[in-house]
Each structure stands twice: as C-alpha cells, then as structure tokens.
C-alpha cells in the first residue's frame, strides 16, 4: 500500500500554491462544533439514502476541468492529466451544471431558544445547512454561500470554508438574502424563521425566482413560537426592533396569536408554491434528521420533475 504521509511542498515550487495550501491547513486545523454535529447527522442519513447520480450517463457525457485545491485527490483523472503539465478532474456534464447556494438567516429573531433543551434557531439552521451541504458535496456537487462574494466550489475544503463562515455570524446580519445572478440550473436553500413582513419575503422570493433559481425554503420554528405556552403575567421582547410588550394574562391572547402565526406561515408557503419552490417547516424540538431527509428528498424530487 502506498504511503499517505504528508510531504511538504518543495520550496522551488511556484508561490501560487502557498495561499491555497495555507488556507486548507487553517480550515482543517479546527472544525467548528456545529460542523461536527452536522457531520454526525449526515453520516446517519447518508447510510439510508441512495446517491443521486443520474442513471444512463456513459463515457460520452464526461467532461474535464482543471484541478482545484478544494477537490478530492480521488477525483483526478490521471490518464487525462498525463497528457498535460496540469491536473484534471473528470465530471459528468449534469454534475458540472449543478450548484446549490445557501442562505442561512442569523438575524436577531433567529437567536432565540425558549428551552435549554433546544438549540437557538440559528444554530439548528446552521446544522441543517451544513448537513445538506455535506450530502451534496459527497455527491460531487458545488456549494456556495450567498453574500460572501466567493464562487461556489466542491469538496471537503468547500464544506469547511462554509462552516467557518456560518459559525461566526455578524451581529447585525441581514434577515433577507441578497440579489442573486446565477445560471438557470442553480438551486437555492433559504433557511430562516420567516418572521419578516410578508411583503418583504414575497419581494425577495420573486427576485430570486426571476433570476432563474429553483429554491427550497426551510422554516425554523421554536416550540414556544408555535404553541404559545405562556400563562399569567408575561413580558415579551422583540430583539429585532427592541420593543417590549407586557401581558397581564398571556393565555387570553393564545388563540388569536396562533391564528396569526399559522396564517403568516401559510402565506410564506403559498408564496413559495406559486413560484414552484418547496416549503418545509421544522421545529427545534424535533429531530434534525427528519428535516434533513425531507429536504434532501425534496431536492431529488424537484430535480426529477425538471428532468435533471
């Protein structure tokens, strides 16, 4: 068996290799805890699902591109690389066209957990995003993170780079994704509590859909937000607008609150469905594996309908 021991780069090699190598070592030195959790979740789900490589693709559908630092060494086509001084990676055409973009909301309203036993919403959103990204990169697909300015990429380095960016959200991070200019085959996963005003959500959705993307919305719900278990005197603080409401008997508004909450959630779902997008709801007191399987299945089903 050939040795896999690490060999340092020869100092005579071009300096252009130094920066990618240093970044790879930095990303691999310490994994964010949420990525560790996501990888544990992914491992369980991966065993229960089949790869989504399109059937019937033969050798004539392969194409080659230059090797990038984030690519796995197993993806190198050595026969093609032997014809040149560069390394080449072999891809199927449909795989090369697939890129999945992510937008994880980590705004003020997402930094909430009603119980110690459940994670804050932004943490669950991060774990689900990373777990799905891990599944996709295992299938050879590219992933990208909106708002970073970085191009999409594939492989373990891409996943770790994404994890480091998601693990440390900005204090005043936007709750809506930026405009997206992409190829029509690309997809977008938007994970949020979707508590923004409905007109803002609808406007953002239309802009993304008109850019050519197909998308998947995942609403992250804290159990208290849906059940409203409060009784007696209760104080409610809205972190996003720094507003406070005090109720003498909170239980008296429960029925009306739940109607409004459900109506808001249903409206977001209708916006998505009218555009041909998928909408899933997930509570933080439920298993993240269930949500991951549903989301992964929704992507596979939508691609099958679109002929990808």
PLM features: what roles do these ranges have?
Residues 2-56, 65-74, 80-85, 89-308:
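Exposed, interaction-prone extracellular/peripheral surfaces
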């Amino acid at each position: 068996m050939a040795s896999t021991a690490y060999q340092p780069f020869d100092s005579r090699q071009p300096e252009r290799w130094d920066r990618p190598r240093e970044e790879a070592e930095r990303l691999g030195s310490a994994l964010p805890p949420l990525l560790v959790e996501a990888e544990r979740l992914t491992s369980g789900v991966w065993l229960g699902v089949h790869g989504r490589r399109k059937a019937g693709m033969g050798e004539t559908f392969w194409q080659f591109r230059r090797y990038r630092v984030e690519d796995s060494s197993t993806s190198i086509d050595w026969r093609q690389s032997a014809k040149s001084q560069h390394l080449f990676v072999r891809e199927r055409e449909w795989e090369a066209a697939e890129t999945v973009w992510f937008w994880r909301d980590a705004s003020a309203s997402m930094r909430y957990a009603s119980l110690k036993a459940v994670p804050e919403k932004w943490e669950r959103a991060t774990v689900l995003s990373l777990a799905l990204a891990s599944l996709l990169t295992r299938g050879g697909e590219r992933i990208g993170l909106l708002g970073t300015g970085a191009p999409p990429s594939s492989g373990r380095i891409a996943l770790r780079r994404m994890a480091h960016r998601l693990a440390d959200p900005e204090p005043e991070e936007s709750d809506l994704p930026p405009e997206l200019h992409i190829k029509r085959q690309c997809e977008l996963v938007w994970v949020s509590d979707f508590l923004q005003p409905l007109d803002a959500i609808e406007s953002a959705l239309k802009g993304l859909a008109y850019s050519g993307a197909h998308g998947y919305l995942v609403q992250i719900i804290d159990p208290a937000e849906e059940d409203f278990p409060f009784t007696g005197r209760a104080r409610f603080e809205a972190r996003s607008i720094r507003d406070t409401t005090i109720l003498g008997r909170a239980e008296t508004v429960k029925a009306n609150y739940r109607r409004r909450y459900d109506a808001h959630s249903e409206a977001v779902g209708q916006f998505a469905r009218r555009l041909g997008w998928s909408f899933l709801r997930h509570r933080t007191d439920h298993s993240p594996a269930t949500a991951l399987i549903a989301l992964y299945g929704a992507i596979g089903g939508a691609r099958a309908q679109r002929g990808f």
